[in-house]
Design a protein with these regions (language model features):
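C-terminal motif of bacterial Sec signal peptides marking the signal peptidase cleavage site
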Residues: 18-21
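N-terminal, intrinsically disordered, polar/charged segments of Gram-positive cell-envelope systems
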Residues: 26-61
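Bacterial N-terminal signal peptides that target proteins for export
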Residues: 1-11
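A short, polar/proline- and glycine-enriched secondary-structure boundary/capping micro-motif
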Residues: 264-274
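Low-complexity, Gly/Ser/Thr/Pro-rich intrinsically disordered linker/tail segments
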Residues: 255-259, 272-312
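Acidic/His-rich structured neighborhood in mature extracellular/periplasmic domains
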Residues: 69, 73-230, 238-242, 249-264
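Compositional signal for N-terminal targeting/processing segments
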Residues: 48-79, 255
């Protein structure tokens, strides 16, 4: 089996376990200023500027207020009632398994740029329940966004590393027939040039999706995908969606809905701007301090996020 670069860990789910590792981002009780480089829309061309990663508001969807906000935003985006119901059933399945008392009880502001949780305890509780097959970020995003994604030329490509996704899909009887083909095509790994040039990588991702006829059709709900690099030094270099979530409009704010990993919670963050969303994701997932691979590239639907920039 092919091996992901060390900063991603042994399995894909390790990508999402950033919470403990990122707890050292604060200094002296204040959030550090970080230099950032922005990329032009759909190009990945960087330009220098400065930004601060700020504290965020987040919830594990235990409280009714946040659940109602998310439900209303999903409904406003045109999601079917049965899909909204299914989403909250999945949320409750996880929350009940690990115990709601072990999650934040209401919308909470972080002390720094990242939510804090006892991830080891949550994993232990998850395992005590048999490590039940739940949902990860990709399954969650597709469950919410799938009706608004078109794939004209399904071609699964390399899905070797999606074995955990496929196990969950099979046991939960999710995504049958054409829907399953769509999932496999969307999340399959993409062969790319061996380069650290995010502009070039973005072009190759866009070209691959265009060839497959992948398009998104919702102006109130968007899938944000964090593309990462698979390079074991022996096989073809590939880009893959290491994390994904759903961005929703909520008045003049934004809600980002994500499932951190099979064994970690559902989480909803509130942001004042799309730039804050990008900076949060880059702070979470740009963990290759040694520069062994290219920087992550964040897509909004089928194009590079306009607010994409790298935090240094």
């Amino acid at each position: 089996m092919r091996r992901i670069k060390p900063f991603l860990g042994a399995l894909l789910l390790g990508v999402c376990m950033f919470l403990t590792a990122c707890s050292g981002q604060k200094e002296g009780g204040e959030t550090k200023q970080k230099t950032a480089s922005s990329a032009e829309s759909s190009q990945g061309e960087e330009k220098k500027e400065t930004s601060a990663v700020i504290p965020i508001m987040y919830s594990n969807l235990v409280d009714e207020e946040t659940r109602n906000r998310v439900s209303a935003a999903l409904k406003n985006a045109g999601l079917k009632d049965e899909k909204i119901t299914d989403f909250f059933l999945a949320v409750d399945e996880y929350n009940n398994a690990v115990g709601k008392e072990n999650l934040v009880q209401k919308t909470t502001m972080t002390d720094g740029p990242f939510p804090s949780m006892d991830s080891d305890r949550l994993i232990d509780l998850w395992l005590q329940n048999g490590g039940f097959v739940g949902r990860n970020c990709r399954i969650t995003s597709f469950s919410l966004m799938g009706d608004f994604i078109a794939v004209k030329n399904p071609a699964a490509g390399d899905t070797t590393m999606l074995f955990s996704d496929f196990e969950a899909i099979g046991k939960k009887h999710l995504f049958q027939g054409e829907e399953r083909k769509k999932f496999d095509t969307l999340f399959s790994y993409i062969d790319v040039t061996n380069t650290h040039d995010t502009k070039e990588l973005a072009k190759e991702i866009i070209a691959s999706w265009k060839k497959k006829g992948i398009s998104f059709h919702n102006d109130k709900m968007h899938m944000l995908s964090v593309f990462m690099t698979m390079d074991d030094g022996k096989n073809q270099v590939q880009e893959f969606i290491g994390h994904t979530g759903i961005l929703l409009e909520d008045g003049d704010h934004y809600l980002f809905v994500e499932k951190l990993a099979f064994e970690l919670p559902y989480q909803v963050e509130e942001f004042r701007s799309r730039q804050e969303v990008n900076d949060y994701l880059m702070a979470c997932y740009d963990k290759d301090a040694d520069g062994l691979t290219a920087k992550p590239v964040i897509f909004e639907d089928d194009q590079v996020m306009k607010e994409y920039r790298v935090l240094e």
